Every structure is written in structure tokens, then in C-alpha cells.
Amino acid sequence: MAVAQSRQVADMITARTGRQVEIVGVTTLGDVSKAQLTQIGGTGVFVSALREALLAGEVDLAVHSLKDLPTGPAAGIALAAVPPRDDPRDALVARDGAKLADLPRGARIGTGSPRRAAQLLALRGDLRCLPIRGNANTRLGQVSDGELDGVVLAYAGLARIGHVNAITQVFEPEEMLPAPGQGALAVECRDGEPELKALLEAVTDQASMAAVTAERSLLEALEAGCSAPIGAYAAGTEQLRMRAAVMSTDGSRVLRAHGGAPGAGAWQLGRDLAAELLRSGASDLIGVPRAPIGQQER
């Protein structure tokens, strides 16, 4: 997945600027650890090694799934580009071509995301949401081998590795809000390098940048990590519309907020919706001790 993402950005840079880009592989803790992400620091574990390589001068650019990127600033590093966002929706891959409504009672659904598990349980409280790790091919194999009845993954990730045909249902944001930044890529470079920043302006999509700015502003204001059960999705060109939700991990409580603002007001839009959610009691849900996903036997 990481190589596919990097190649996507490299090809875009070459097509738009004529500059050739070499892909340099970097192994992260998130790639090698078999522990659940919530146990080893959340999806930010995919970011640290890349940033270290960037600061050490081993690479000039680092490409991340934007939803993995911590919201706080990183010393010496700049978020220099957000290319056009891919499809942000979540997708189900289930046995025998089944949609969510077709699955048997108590069906086993694999997901390592508290956000996905919570929204699945809100849709169907009888499901068994089981924790999974490994790359997308490993997860898909657990379905074809019969270990799981289905898995929920990001549509964009499946598309990048050529597995769209395996999808049996795509969840609209009204059914399952994506993670903040889902479907978008982030390109970081060392701060204080104007030539690199100027180069990356060629691949930045301003509408995508505004949308993810609003979503990440909300996440930061809620003081929640990227593994928290929070969904957010903003879209629009001149005028942004955004929906957000905070949920209990068992799906029994979901707090929602929505609003709009001009693209230039993206950051404040995220703050405003976060404030609305906090007034509704979101901090209680974010701060509730969470049982491991696999223990939600309902």
C-alpha cells in the first residue's frame, strides 16, 4: 500500500513538473508489529520512521495516508502538499458477494478501527467485530479462507492495490462516516526548503486541502487521536459542507454535528463542530475506557 501511494505521488510530480522521483522504502513499527494499533500508539506509528528519515536527509519527501498523520506540528517538518483526494468511503468485502444486510446474525467482521466497529454495531448490533492486522491482501485472505464473514477497509486503499472488484458494498458517509483525512495523501518535506515546497505546489489540490484541514481541525479540537471513534467528512469547492460524529465503541450512542463555511474558513469550521460535539457530551465518549474490539460479543 505504501509503495502504491508513493508511486502515485511520484508519477504526479513527474507528470506535472518533469522531475524524476526515486522511491525509497522505509519500514515502520506499524508495518512489522502484530499488536493492535491502539496498543502501540495508534496509526501515528506509521509516520515516525518516515519523519526520521526525512530529518536525517535520507529522503526529501515523505508520503503518508493523511488519516495516519498526527494533528500536532512536527519540529522541522512541513505538510507541503495534499494531492487530489481519492474516494473517502469505507467498503465491505464479504463472502459470497453479501451486503451488510445479507450477512447472518452474529457474522464475524474484521476491523482494526474502533470507528468502523462502532458504526457497524450501530447499523447491526448483532455483529461480532473482531480485531485484525496485516496488509490488505492478508485481510482479504481471511475472508476467502472462511476465518471471517467480511472485512471493512478503505475504498481508496483497495483501489490503489487493484482490488475494487472484491468490494461487495460501499458505505455512503450517511451510513458510515470516514476517518478524518481518509482517502487523502499527505506529502511532507523538511521545513525551510522553499524549492521543495514550490515543487509540491504543482500536486496540491486546494479543495482537498480545505476539506482535510476542517476534518483535522475537528480532531485536534476534540483532543483525540486518529484511533478514536470519530468520523468526519467535508467536501465542496467554494463552500465546504461538513458532517462529524463521535460514538461509543459499542455503537449505542452517536453524537452528530454538521455545518458549512467558505473554503478559507475550513479550520474554524472544524473547531466550531468540535465545540458543538463537546457541548453534547463528546468528551464522555472519547474518554470512556474501551474494551478491545474483539470482546464486543453482541
Protein language model regions, located:
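Short glycine-rich, flexible loops that bind phosphorylated cofactors or substrates
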Residues: 70-71, 160
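A conserved helix-loop-strand patch within extracytoplasmic ligand-binding domains
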Residues: 66-69, 75-127
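Short, Asp-centered acidic motifs that coordinate Mg2+ and/or phosphate
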Residues: 59-63, 149-150
